[in-house]
């Protein structure tokens, strides 16, 4: 192995641990850098240990059922030989229909497993700058150190790195009531690009009062300071509390919007149809399956968001794939910077995964680590990188983050709204998700079996675990 330059993985979270394992299992040396050290009292504001793959929030990887987004991703990762999912299965604790783990045992076991691998060198200490040479996988997460963040900032450019996630809810398009919502742009300028949910005065006042009274989630201390310096992150509930009409002069502004189904908006008999306020939704993906509630960045608790936002006419049955959030979250503008292989466009030997690239959730971070690690070792071996089938949950997620509109890019969790449509529509949602699952797992099986080298790599990973 003297002639093999080790691949460097920066960050020992879920993505980094998975990436390092895939590299090592392929027979290539890897240096896994982890900044945290209990002995040296060097931890992040959110971490409590220096173990690899520490779960800092929930101990749950999400729903187990494979006709759910998280569960399908679990199933795909099992096929691909993921060490994270294997250890999650081993250390599972009862949690209803979710895959939850004993987080202490889970992280300790992964740390021991990686440290004992002959191809893995675990280095404790901060990496203050992006390495210039060799193949590198960046998985430093949402709490990347200040020095490395500055190095990444210089590499990506000022406009392509975010430090605070203030995002509006994202809704499944087919759950929006089109009998109420209408397509239009303000003053009919250009293409009808927005779905508009009109409110009369009574509806608006009820919504405003509910929003003012709704319960907020508390920002952590280290997030409060960041929020002070984030331009334009005023939560919709704070805007509501500033006055009854504040939202009507902001994101719920009604001027220039009229439902053409009523006819000419100038006609006197149609004056009664002019909305008092309008909530707008902007298309989030190319296929128009996901819609973003414009200007609704919020710090409300998730249950409150669903209750209050479903008061908006047309959103009574809205299905949320991502709730609004406001928290510290260092992430890059992936559509501008990354290929679906998770390589940086301007430096193909630098790859990234985890929350840093705008995927949300433990399982998505694991999937990103799998792909980035797999492609890193393929590049080191002189092979072409691979992309996962877009019909899979993992493949569709990486296709989405690398092809979304850069201007409005916000992190995305796994969800069925980003998977390509079926050839024939299945009306029942649960049945449709089951068909998505069957197609995804069949396509992934065929994909794994296609290139002989790749088949051997995945088979070796699965067998040796």
UniProtKB/Swiss-Prot annotation:
It catalyses: uridine(54) in tRNA + (6R)-5,10-methylene-5,6,7,8-tetrahydrofolate + NADH + H(+) = 5-methyluridine(54) in tRNA + (6S)-5,6,7,8-tetrahydrofolate + NAD(+); uridine(54) in tRNA + (6R)-5,10-methylene-5,6,7,8-tetrahydrofolate + NADPH + H(+) = 5-methyluridine(54) in tRNA + (6S)-5,6,7,8-tetrahydrofolate + NADP(+). Its cofactor is FAD. One of its GO terms (cellular component) is cytosol. FAD binds at residues 11-16. GO terms for molecular function: flavin adenine dinucleotide binding; tRNA (uracil(54)-C5)-methyltransferase activity, 5,10-methylenetetrahydrofolate-dependent. Keywords: Cytoplasm, FAD, Flavoprotein, Methyltransferase, NAD, NADP, Transferase, tRNA processing. InterPro entries: FAD/NAD-bd_sf, MnmG-rel, MnmG_N, TrmFO. Its EC number is 2.1.1.74. It holds the Pfam family GIDA. It comes from the Bacteria. Its main location: cytoplasm. GO terms for biological process: tRNA methylation; tRNA wobble uridine modification. It is found in: Cytoplasm. It is an enzyme of class 2 (transferase). Catalyzes the folate-dependent formation of 5-methyl-uridine at position 54 (M-5-U54) in all tRNAs. PANTHER family: GLUCOSE INHIBITED DIVISION PROTEIN A, METHYLENETETRAHYDROFOLATE--TRNA-(URACIL-5-)-METHYLTRANSFERASE TRMFO. Belongs to the MnmG family. TrmFO subfamily. This is Methylenetetrahydrofolate--tRNA-(uracil-5-)-methyltransferase TrmFO. It comes from Acaryochloris marina (strain MBIC 11017).
């Amino acid at each position: 192995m003297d002639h093999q330059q080790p691949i460097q993985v920066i960050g020992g979270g879920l993505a980094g641990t998975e990436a390092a394992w895939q590299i090592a299992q392929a027979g290539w040396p890897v240096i896994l850098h982890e900044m945290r050290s209990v002995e040296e009292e060097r931890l992040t504001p959110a971490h409590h240990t220096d173990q690899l793959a520490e779960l800092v929030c929930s101990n749950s990887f999400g729903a187990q059922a494979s006709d759910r987004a998280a569960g399908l991703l679990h199933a795909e990762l099992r096929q691909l030989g993921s060490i994270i999912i294997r250890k999650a299965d081993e250390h599972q604790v009862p949690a209803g229909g979710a895959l939850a783990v004993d987080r202490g045992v889970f992280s300790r076991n992964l740390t021991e497993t990686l440290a004992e691998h002959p191809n893995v060198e675990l280095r404790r200490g901060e990496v203050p700058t992006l390495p210039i040479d060799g193949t590198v996988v960046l998985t430093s997460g949402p709490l990347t150190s200040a020095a490395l963040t500055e190095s990444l900032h210089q590499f990506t450019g000022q406009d392509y790195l975010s430090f605070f996630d203030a995002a509006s809810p994202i809704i499944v398009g087919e759950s929006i009531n089109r009998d109420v919502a209408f397509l239009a742009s303000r003053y009919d300028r250009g293409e009808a690009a927005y779905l508009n949910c009109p409110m009369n005065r009574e509806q608006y006042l009820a919504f405003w009062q509910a929003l003012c009274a709704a319960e907020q989630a508390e920002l952590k201390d280290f997030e409060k300071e960041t929020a002070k310096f984030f331009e334009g992150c005023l939560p919709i509930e704070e805007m509501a509390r500033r006055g009854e009409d504040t939202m009507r002069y902001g994101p719920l502004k009604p001027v220039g919007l009229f439902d053409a189904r009523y006819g000419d908006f100038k006609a006197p008999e149609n004056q009664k149809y002019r909305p008092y306020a309008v909530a707008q939704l902007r298309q989030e993906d190319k296929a128009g399956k996901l819609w973003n509630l414009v200007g609704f960045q919020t710090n409300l608790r998730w249950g409150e968001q669903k209750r209050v936002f479903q008061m908006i006419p047309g959103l009574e049955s809205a299905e949320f794939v991502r709730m609004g959030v406001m928290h510290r979250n260092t992430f890059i503008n992936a559509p501008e910077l990354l290929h679906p292989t998770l390589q940086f466009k301007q430096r193909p030997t630098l790859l990234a995964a985890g929350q840093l690239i705008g995927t949300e959730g433990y399982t998505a971070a694991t999937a990103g680590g799998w792909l980035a690690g797999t492609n890193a070792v393929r590049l080191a071996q002189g092979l072409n990188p691979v992309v996962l089938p877009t019909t899979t949950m993992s493949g569709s997620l990486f296709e989405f983050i690398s092809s979304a509109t850069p201007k409005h890019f916000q992190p995305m969790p796994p969800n069925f709204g980003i998977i390509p449509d079926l050839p024939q529509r299945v009306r029942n949602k649960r049945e449709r998700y089951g068909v998505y699952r069957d197609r995804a797992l069949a396509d992934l099986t065929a994909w794994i079996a296609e290139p002989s080298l790749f088949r051997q790599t995945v088979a070796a990973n699965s067998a040796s675990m």
